[in-house]
Amino acid sequence: MRTEYCGQLNLSHVGQEVTLCGWVNRRRDLGGLIFIDMRDREGIVQVFFDPDQKAAFDKAYDLRNEFCIQIVGTVRARPDSQINKDMATGEVEVFAHALEIINRSEPLPLDSNQVNSEEARLKYRYLDLRRPEMADRLKTRAKITSFVRRFMDSHGFLDIETPMLTKATPEGARDYLVPSRVHKGKFYALPQSPQLFKQLLMMSGFDRYYQIVKCFRDEDLRADRQPEFTQIDVETSFMTAEQVREVMEKLARELWLDVKNVDLGDFPIMTFEEAMRRYGSDKPDLRNPLELVDVADLVKDVEFKVFSGPANDAKGRVAAICVPGGAQLTRKLIDEYGAFVNIYGAKGLAWLKVNDRAAGMEGVQSPIAKFLSAEVLEAILARTNAQSGDILFFGADSFKIVTDAMGALRLKLGRDLELTKLDSWAPLWVVDFPMFEEDGEGGLAAMHHPFTAPRDMSPEELAGTPTNAIANAYDMVINGYEVGGGSVRIHRSEMQQTVFSILGINEHEQREKFGFLLDALKYGTPPHAGLAFGLDRLVMLLTGTDNIRDVIAFPKTTAAACLMTEAPSFANPASLQELAICVVKKASEQESE
């Protein structure tokens, strides 16, 4: 039905007759002619109708926004005075000879001239996706997946599918369960990741695997989370962590070059401990120059208990952030930052303005200055590299509260004061994560997942001092987003059983939930390692949006609902009976009946 896309016409098409299909983006009458902007997935081109072509001109009178049409016309170069440099097709226009109105459109429930609510956009998603910026994002997504497949294929990886209906295993979030009609009372689980299957493929000898795969997690949503999401899943045998990172870094660098024409350069490597101490985050945004600086050793003996208390506590922390030019901040704004860190458990935010670096005590302004000796003040200013016109913010509390609060403050200051270089790219690898973290109930939980191998420890050493264990894990971070994470996997049954035991999974439960894995580990399992990229987050970064719903064709809301199809919905009672499922109503629902 078409010979060209609207958005691809240029001066090379001048004089050619073309057939275009698409939608009326805008219509206007000017000087006896009818002009429309015609749109398809590739962009917009100007089309005009002349009374000399009476049949087409008469039909064009009926055109309204979003009518679906086909036109036949000749491409012409626009006069120099009419060239539109804001349009990709702005040097040309199409003189229409014939017009067919394929389908008319009622007035749209979305207004193209104003910002529509996200609720309206999701309810009428098929209309929202007609917008050029939305189409561009999905086209970029398609370009990314196509590039990834070519790269992986060229590096010897095999695209192998893994099951969608599988067994529930503890991976950190709730599973979506699917009842079995044949095996009444039993349930499949939709996979949170293909983790165990890809490890089993390594045990099967496939060596290099990848898959662009849907994953499912029933968890509370955030702006960058969805109940169903897409991973670029990768696993390798006989490769070290360093070799895996090398290949995956090459993929990221070539992807950025292909999509953005940006060379990311070599990725620096930073340990988890360094990232938390310097940036207050295990996914630091290195575009922001601000850092957390530890000063606990300098304030152990000051009379200010807010500082000296945590400074003398093995689990405490006192850290400062030096903000260049921050001495100009008003007291009102400083108080707002104090309220901000309260969100993260901090009891307050101490501050010190450096008005004149050379003037010592006389050159600073702060409610806490009276508690600091000249020597302590000088030591703090020297360590933080404070200069005249700067401000220091201090956090003092438990290590976790200070790290979380000051890390969040660092990001906010970077945005508010325009210190973060938003037009740049800052990738890195974060490595050497703790193997375990406290679960809040007196036990331990795996920081990544329970199949990650420890670095340089035997099962006996791991069982003896699990809190000292460092995981052989790595995350790829770009501009403060964790875009991919992976690890070397456990490939010996004894080590896997030890990890399960540390996590409180007894022998019976190990056999019940992971018997197939423990059995497979007995039969010559090769060393293996892998990584998974979050495709949705990659597309977010590469398209410049901060909302994951902008890069998914039909996303869910933060309440895990689809406003367009009204999913989830109630099941037919007959279907529930066939599945042997009984829906238990809440007491409040029973009372209302």
UniProtKB/Swiss-Prot annotation:
Main location, first listed in the record: cytoplasm
Chain residue ranges for the region called Aspartate: 195-198
One record GO biological process: aspartyl-tRNA aminoacylation
GO MF assignments: aspartate-tRNA ligase activity; ATP binding; nucleic acid binding
Pfam families named in the record: GAD, tRNA-synt_2, tRNA_anti-codon
Keywords, comma-separated and alphabetical: Aminoacyl-tRNA synthetase, ATP-binding, Cytoplasm, Ligase, Nucleotide-binding, Protein biosynthesis
SUPFAM superfamilies per the UniProt record, alphabetical: Class II aaRS and biotin synthetases (SSF55681), GAD domain-like (SSF55261), Nucleic acid-binding proteins (SSF50249)
Keyword Cytoplasm: yes
Catalyzed reactions per annotation: tRNA(Asp) + L-aspartate + ATP = L-aspartyl-tRNA(Asp) + AMP + diphosphate
Binding site for ATP: 217-219, 226, 482, 534-537
EC number of the protein: 6.1.1.12
A single cellular component GO annotation: cytoplasm
Endpoints of the signal sequence: none
Localization of this protein: Cytoplasm
Domain of life of the source: Bacteria
PROSITE patterns linked: AA_TRNA_LIGASE_II
Family: Belongs to the class-II aminoacyl-tRNA synthetase family. Type 1 subfamily.
HAMAP family: Asp_tRNA_synth_type1
Function field: Catalyzes the attachment of L-aspartate to tRNA(Asp) in a two-step reaction: L-aspartate is first activated by ATP to form Asp-AMP and then transferred to the acceptor end of tRNA(Asp).
Name of this chain's protein: Aspartate--tRNA ligase
Native organism: Serratia proteamaculans (strain 568)
Lineage: Bacteria, Pseudomonadati, Pseudomonadota, Gammaproteobacteria, Enterobacterales
Gene: aspS
